[in-house]
Amino acid sequence: MGPIDTSQRLARLRELMQERKVDVYVVPSEDSHQSEYIAHCDGRREFISGFTGSAGCAIVSMTKAALSTDGRYFNQAAKQLDNNWILLKRGFENMPTWQEWTAEQAEGGKVVGVDPSLITASDARNLSETIKKCGGSLLGVQENLVDLVWGAERPARPSEKVALHPIEFAGKSFEEKISDLRKELQKKKCAGFVISMLDEIAWLFNLRGNDIPYNPVFFAYAIITQSTADLYIDEEKLPAEVKNYLGDKVSLKPYSSIFEDAKVLGQSAQNKSDGETSTKPPQKFLISTRASWSLSLALGGEKNVEEVRSPITDAKAIKNEAELEGMRACHIRDGAALSEYFAWLENELVNKKTVLNEVDASDKLEQIRSKHQHFVGLSFDTISSTGPNAAVIHYKAERNNCSIIDPKAVYLCDSGAQYLDGTTDTTRTLHFGEPTEMEKKAYTLVLKGLISIDTAVFPKGTTGFALDAFARQYLWKEGLDYLHGTGHGVGSYLNVHEGPIGLGTRVQYSEVAIAPGNVISDEPGYYEDGVFGIRIESPFFPHLLINLPFLLTPIIDIIMAKEVKTTHKFGEKPWLGFEHVTMTPLCQKLINPSLLSDVEKKWVNDYHTEIWEKTSKYFENDELTRNWLKRETQPI
C-alpha cells in the first residue's frame, strides 16, 4: 500500500493544536488499555500518518511531522509515509529516539501535548523529564485531537458479545485465579489492583471477546480488592450465560465509570493515609507499569499507587497443564493445515501453472484452517509474501495491491490461528523452483540459529535477553543480522504476542527469567532488501531436563520451557530446556546440508519424523498432501 496524502489532516490537526496552545502533539499507537493490537476506532496514528504497522509513534509540530518505528517496519514505513513525514528508525546510530526528537521541537518553552489515556504513567514521566531538559513542558490533553480531525468518519467502538472460556481449556477457575491474586496483594500490602490490560482481564475471568481483530479480548477494566471483584464492562456485551457464570462473586459496573470510581478510591486512600490510626489498612493501589497516565492520575498519582509489573501477566505467562496440552494439540492440527496448504500451493503453481496472488493464497490457508476442530479465527493478519515482498518483515498484502506469487522466487508465509485450546504462530519460507546458493546459505544459517535456541540447555534464572545471541551467532559470523527480536511469548487462546517473556534485546527481556510453562516463539530471520526474506518461526515450551547425558538433544520449534535433569547440577540450580510444538516441515530444497553438523542433521531428521508421525493421519484420504508431506519429511 502506497502513501496517502496527509496534508489536509495535518493542517486540521495543527489548527486544533494552535487553538489549545499546544506546539507539539504526540500520537502513540496504543489504545487506552495500552494494547499492541487495536480496534479500528483506535487507529489514530495510522489515520494521521498513513502508516499501517502495529508499532510506532507519530509526532507533529507546527512545521514538521515524524514517525518513529522499529526494524520490522522500516521498509513498510518508507513506502507508506508521504513527503510530509520524517522517518525515525528506532535503534539506528545517530538517529534520535522519538522522545529526543519531540524534546528538540519543544526547545524555547514550547508545550508538548498528548492524550494521557494513550501513554503510560512512567512513559509520561520520562517524556516530561526529557522535554524539560530542552526547556519545554508536557501537557495531558484530555480531548483527543486526532479524533476531532477524524470526525464522523471514525469507526464506531466495537461492542461484541463476550463468551465463556471453558475450564477444560482454561485449566483453572476464575475464583482460584482471583484468590491467587489476592494472596499477591496481601504480600505487597496493597489495598487492591486496578487492571487495565485487556488480555489480563480476559485471562483472569476466563472470558473471551471479539472487540479487537485477531485478539479474543473485550473492552473492560477491573478492580480487585481483598473483598470485592468489580468488572467494568458495558452489560449489553454479556449474555445471560456469562452473567450467571459470574454470579454474585463479581459486581458489574459500566465501562465508562472506571475513572470516576478510581477517583473515589484515590480520595479514600488519601483520607485514610492522612489519619492517625496505627492499625490502618494498606492504602496504596497496585497498577501495572503498562497502565495509562490518566488512570494513575485518577487514582491520585504516585502518592496513592504503586506501579509494578502486573502479577497477572506473570501468572498468565506460566501455562498450566491444561493450557500446555491445548497448545500441543492445536499445533498438531495447525501443522496439518499448513502442510495441506503448502502441498496445494505447490501443486497449483508448479503443476497446474495457476496464477495466484498473495491474497488468494492466504484466503485458501484460512479456509483450510477453518475445517479443523476448535478453530475460531486467525491470530494475526497472514503475511503471504513472494520474492522482494518477503524482505518486508511485517509485509501486508492488500487485495487490490499485492503481487502474483512467483514460483521461481522465495515465498514466505507467517501465519497463525486462534483455537479454543490454544494460539499458533508459524513462519515457513519455501521455494517452488531452484533457489540460489545465497538463498540456501541464508536459510541454513537461520535454521542453525533456530536449532541452537531449540536445543539450548541453561540454568534456572536465565533470561531471553541472554539466549538471543544463540540464534544470531551463525549470521554474525558472516556479518549478517536481522532487525527484530528472536521470539515472543504466546498466549493460550489469547494475544499472539504476550509478555513479559521473550527472546531479544529489549530491556524487559533482561528482567524476567524463562520459566517452566512459558510458551515462546523461536523466529530468527535474514532479509535482503528488494531481493528476498528468510524467516523460520516455531513456538516452544521451556522444560526441566531429565537425565541428559549431553546438551544437544533434539527438541523443537513454538517452544515450551520446562525443567530437565542434567548429568551435573552446578550450584544445585535446576536446568531448563525447550520442548517444540510446531508441527510443520522445513523446506528441504532450501537446506544446504553441508553447512549443518551431524547433530543438526539428526535434529532435522528427528523433527521431520515426529511431524510425519503426528500429522500424517490427517491425510489418509488426501493423496496430494500425504505425498508432499512424505517427501518433505524424508531424511536429509
From Swiss-Prot:
GO terms for cellular component: cytoplasm. Keywords: Aminopeptidase, Hydrolase, Manganese, Metal-binding, Metalloprotease, Protease. Its EC number is 3.4.11.9. Its cofactor is Mn(2+). GO terms for biological process: proteolysis. Signal peptide: none annotated. Pfam families: Creatinase_N, Creatinase_N_2, Peptidase_M24, Peptidase_M24_C. It comes from the Eukaryota. GO terms for molecular function: metal ion binding; metalloaminopeptidase activity. It catalyses: Release of any N-terminal amino acid, including proline, that is linked to proline, even from a dipeptide or tripeptide. CDD domains: APP. Mn(2+) 1 binds at residues 425, 523, 537. It is an enzyme of class 3 (hydrolase). Binds 2 manganese ions per subunit. Mn(2+) 2 binds at residues 414, 425, 537. Catalyzes the removal of a penultimate prolyl residue from the N-termini of peptides. Belongs to the peptidase M24B family. This is Probable Xaa-Pro aminopeptidase P. The lineage of its organism: Eukaryota, Fungi, Dikarya, Ascomycota, Pezizomycotina.
